[in-house]
Amino acid sequence: MRECNSCSHRVVHVYCARKEKVMSQLLEEIESLRGSMKTLNDFFFDHPELGNEEFLAHGKLTDLLESEGFTVDREVSGLQTAFRAVYHVQGGGPKIGLLCEYDALEGLGHACGHNLQGPSICAAAIGLRRTLQVPATLVVYGTPAEETASGKLVMAKEGVFDDLDVAFMMHGSDSTTVDGKSLALNLVNIKFHGKSAHAAIAPEKGISALDAVLLFFNGMEYLREHVPTEVRMHGIITDGGKAANIVPDYACTQWYIRSSSRIRLDEVVERVKQVAQGAALQVGATMEWDEVKAYDNKVNVQSLNDLLLKNAEIVGAPDISEPRKVTGSTDFSSVTFRVPGACLRVKFVGRGVTSHSQEWLDNGKTQLAEDAIMYGAKGIALTVEEILTTPGLLAQIQEDFQQSKANY
């Protein structure tokens, strides 16, 4: 049976008009939240809380989501200031993760802009809840202590994010972009134990743990030549002894070891461990390997990044730019190593202004900050709506994720 061209065009026109109406309703719903989200942002900014102590922010966000009909777990993975809020649209469907941070910096308050995230993510979640016309499960996560104890890492280890189909975050920035790659990280304290003695009267009776540390540093310099060029290894001495006239029976050095590949990093870490064991052996000390935390690398899903950045441009986010080529490590990678995920970074400071600075802090309650909250919410919400309403798009993103992960 031959399809009538005029009917086909009419069907397409009706579909596009309906989709445009849904998008317009979604954006209008989010915009209607501007005033309340600004109030929330300003409250967070004026009441900065350190990691795992974000009780005020936790209370504000969970109360808000509960008032919108979300079912809220107010403690997750043993973290008192973590939460999980769930809403099933039309009985539930693909699980969409929306993550936010809200911890501040000691002495600098919200100089990393985490005050923006909760309002932006909640605005996206509420807008979607009120307007979505297809089955979906919206899951908002409060993830504490990004700056210190890495709440997402704790939650990821317990499988909290494993059932998500896709995950999103928002962060302030000096331009509007998406996160590219991030580096896998192992943060370790390497502790050497020796034997104390009087350094002048009987040094031969001592075993210097500090000597082991110094030998370890020398060994690391030789190791650098034999690891991939993208590997980063940097360390400090955190304890070198108590007095110069005592042979130190204890010394400690802390190291950050990074690579763009978790598999490659695991291999390098084993070699670092051998260097430490060798340093201890040379002086007769013992070595204790204390791993503080380990981040995976972010798995980059180009199709998802492109989609998110396209929608950020559609909603008018300023100063669109390509992803950063050089980056550090983040606990969000503990999520994106498990499920497809993307972080939309929205401009609210001038180009070249870095986070953890006074200038970044000074912009926390400006009009630019308020606008960034809205741009982030709208860009992420439009992306979620497009994924849920475009046949095959989610499956393609998940396939791209698996292929990208296989390349690391």
Regions found by a protein language model. Give the residues of each.
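Buried hydrophobic packing segments
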Residues: L61, S120-L128, G151, A212-M220, ...
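Non-cysteine beta-strand/loop elements that form the S-adenosyl-L-methionine
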Residues: G97-L99, H193, C343-V349
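Acidic/His- and Gly-rich active-site-bordering loop/insert found
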Residues: E20-P135
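Histidine/acidic-residue-rich, glycine-tolerant segments that coordinate divalent metal ions
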Residues: T81-H88, D103-A111, N115-P119, V134-Y250, ...
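Short, Lys/Arg-enriched N-terminal segments with co-localized hydrophobic residues
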Residues: N5-V22
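Divalent metal-coordination and catalytic microenvironments
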Residues: F44, L98, H114, V140, ...
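Metal-dependent amide/peptide-bond hydrolase catalytic core
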Residues: L214-Y408
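Phosphate-handling active-site elements
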Residues: V72-D73, G93-P94, A125-Y141, M220-V231, ...
